[in-house]
Structure formats: C-alpha cells, structure tokens
C-alpha cells in the first residue's frame, strides 16, 4: 500500500485529494525550512560582528535579508494555495459524495429522524474535517519532517 493509498484510506480522500494533501505536506515543509533562513542569517551576522568583519559584508547581509523576505513570501503563498484552496476543493467532493450516499438511503429512515439535527450533525462533521485538513494535518506532518531535516542538518554544520 503506497503512502497516497494510506492517506486515501485513513482520511477518506479522493485520489486527487490525496495528491493535493501530499503537495500540502511538501509545501508546508519547504515553508518551514525557509523560515529557518533568517536564523542562519542572524547567526552569520553575530559571527561577523564578533570577528569585526561586519562593515565589509553589510551589502551582502542586506541582500540576504531581502532574499529571505522574498523566499518567505513565495513559499507562504504556495503553502496557502496548497493547503487551504485544495482543501476546499476536496471538501466539495466530500459533500457531493455524502449527498450521493444520503440519496440511496430509504425515505423511511428520514421520517424517524429530526432532519435539522441530522443535517447539522453531518455538515458540522464536514466542516470539522475541512478545518482539520486545512489547518492541522499538513502542518503537523510538515513540522515533523522539517524538524527532522533541520536537526540532521545541524549535525553537519
């Protein structure tokens, strides 16, 4: 069973939803790693300040700060599109699938239930999964991956 199939099974995603979720993991991981660049710049700034070579490299640090800001902006934009927009596309698919399943249930079932309560419960659950897939799941996996990558890279520095 591939990772994509595991995601489809675990989170009840469509095939495209699983692909989008993997893309969200990757983009959030890259965004987290790019957020570490200013820390590296600060380390180099303090190191050069302590060595007394900061004046010669001022333009280099200004350019580095500008590049960091641009990279953070670009990766955050990509992460936003990968996590939030794709989540709501998948949510539409999930709502349609739910409606198709409800269509197949006999009408006598709905006569025994309070329709307002049933609708509120189901749509509340869908809204909760939307929030989970847009806010928590990609960032959780990305934080694990990026933390491991950053920890390993610190051993080599």
Which stretches of residues belong to each language-model region?
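Hydrophobic alpha-helical interface/terminus motif in multipass membrane transporters
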Residues: 42-46, 82-86, 98, 102, ...
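Alpha-helical transmembrane segments of polytopic integral membrane proteins
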Residues: 39-46, 80, 95-96, 112, ...
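Transmembrane helix-loop-helix hairpins at lipid-water interfaces of multipass membrane proteins
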Residues: 21-75
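Short intracellular "coupling" helices and adjacent cytoplasmic loop segments at the cytosolic face
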Residues: 1-2, 97-120, 124-126
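Residue-level hotspots within the lipid-embedded alpha helices of multi-pass solute transporters
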Residues: 31-36, 69-73, 85-89, 105, ...
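Hydrophobic alpha-helical transmembrane segments of ABC transporter permease domains
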Residues: 26, 30-38, 43, 126-157
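Membrane-interfacial segments
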Residues: 46-54, 87, 91, 106, ...
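Membrane-integrated ABC transporters
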Residues: 1-35, 58-60, 79-83, 87, ...
């Amino acid at each position: 069973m591939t990772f994509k199939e595991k995601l489809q099974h675990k989170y009840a995603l469509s095939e495209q939803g699983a692909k989008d979720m993997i893309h969200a993991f990757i983009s959030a991981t890259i965004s987290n790693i790019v957020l570490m660049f200013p820390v590296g710049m600060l380390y180099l700034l303090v190191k050069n300040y302590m060595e007394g070579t900061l004046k010669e490299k001022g333009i280099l640090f200004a350019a580095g700060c500008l590049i960091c800001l641009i990279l953070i902006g670009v990766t955050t934009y990509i992460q936003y599109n990968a996590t939030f927009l794709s989540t709501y596309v998948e949510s539409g698919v999930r709502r349609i699938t739910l409606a198709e399943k409800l269509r197949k249930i006999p009408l006598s079932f709905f006569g025994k239930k309070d329709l307002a309560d049933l609708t509120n419960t189901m749509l509340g659950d869908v809204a909760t999964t939307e929030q989970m897939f847009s806010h928590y799941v990609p960032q959780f996996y990305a934080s694990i991956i990026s933390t491991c990558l950053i920890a390993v890279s610190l051993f080599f520095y």
